[in-house]
Regions:
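Catalytic Walker B motif of ABC-type/P-loop ATPase nucleotide-binding domains
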Residues: 198-201
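Conserved catalytic motifs of ABC-family nucleotide-binding domains
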Residues: 194
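The feature captures the beta-strand-to-loop junction immediately N-terminal to the Walker
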Residues: 72-74
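Helix-to-loop junction immediately C-terminal to a conserved catalytic motif
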Residues: 87
Length: 303
């Protein structure tokens, strides 16, 4: 009986090995080999503005291979703009962004398309196709960017969904699952092509504590399992500090502090201290700048 079982398993093992071989060598998956520079992403002396409104100023950041790096700061400080520059959606006025040694702003349309196939992106609110099933959402990048057979696509999608705990929900549509589950589907889609770089834009926004903790664990575990480099933009201190290797703090388009989560928890920098401890007043004031209340009430000159 055992020999019979073994003989039945051998063809399955061969098919599995063949599938893996096809996946990596003969399927249409991008075959770009980036130079093995220590930092997968480098930002140097970067300036970016919308017209006269300066968004980023003299930015310098490193994102080492295999690490999970967080970019934190208040709303409007330029965090998401950094992700858009890395993805080549916008171009800097000065300085450069390099991914795998390539200057992103110098790439033509074909070069950008090739580069983006090596990236995974989790958008702030998932951006799932609401008229497609969960399975079809995750299958979408595989069908767009590879020549895999439907059988292989099916197996890969089910494996990705299994990794986020939603294989048995594959036939449902996004409107039939919770917001936390939808975020996990978006994670599965982001890793569909086993990207070298994964960018997460506010992955914890709007999630309940259970979904938030689960999503944080997924991001860390997937980063390590895939050997990818992850860039995490977030406001959520506890979840981000629990999984990040290194953190950049931004304010008004500049890096105001950086370090490991442990270092930043004990930082004496006023901005970092206010942000980490959720203090209501500090470098980011409670009151909008302007006249004092006494002046506004006409009491400023009274004795």
């Amino acid at each position: 009986m055992c020999c019979s079982d073994a003989s039945e398993r051998l063809p399955k093992l061969r098919r599995a090995k063949q599938a893996l071989w096809l996946l990596h060598y003969n399927t249409g998956f991008p075959k770009t080999e980036y130079p093995l520079v220590p930092n997968l992403v480098e930002i140097r002396d970067l300036e970016f503005a919308y017209g006269d409104r300066k968004i980023l100023s003299n930015l310098r950041m490193d994102f080492p291979r295999g690490k999970l790096i967080a970019v934190m700061g208040g709303s409007g400080c330029g965090k998401t703009t950094v992700l858009r520059l890395i993805g080549g959606q916008i171009r800097p006025q000065r300085g450069e962004v390099r991914v795998g040694g390539e200057a992103v702003h110098k790439l033509n349309t074909e070069g950008l398309y090739r580069l983006r196939r090596r990236m995974g992106m989790l958008f702030q609110f998932g951006a799932l196709f609401t008229d497609l099933t969960i399975f079809e959402n995750v299958a979408f990048p595989l069908r767009e960017h590879t020549n895999l057979s439907e059988e292989l696509i099916r197996n890969l999608v089910l494996m990705k969904l299994n990794a986020v705990g939603l294989r048995n929900a594959s036939k449902l549509k996004p409107g039939e699952i919770s917001g936390g589950m939808a975020r996990r589907v978006a994670v599965a889609r982001a890793i569909a092509l086993d990207p070298e770089l994964i960018m997460y834009d506010e992955p914890f926004a709007g999630l309940d504590p259970i979904s938030m903790g689960l999503t944080a664990s997924l991001i860390r575990n997937l980063n390590d399992a895939l050997g990818s480099t992850s860039i995490l933009v977030s406001h959520d201190v506890n979840e981000t500090f629990a999984i990040a290797d290194y953190v950049y703090f931004m304010s008004a388009g500049k890096i105001v502090a950086e370090g490991t989560p442990a270092e930043l928890r004990v930082s004496t920098d006023p901005y970092v201290k206010q942000f980490v401890n959720a203090e209501p007043d500090g470098p980011v004031p409670f009151h909008y700048p302007g006249k004092s209340l006494a002046d506004d009430l006409g009491l400023g000159t009274q004795r």
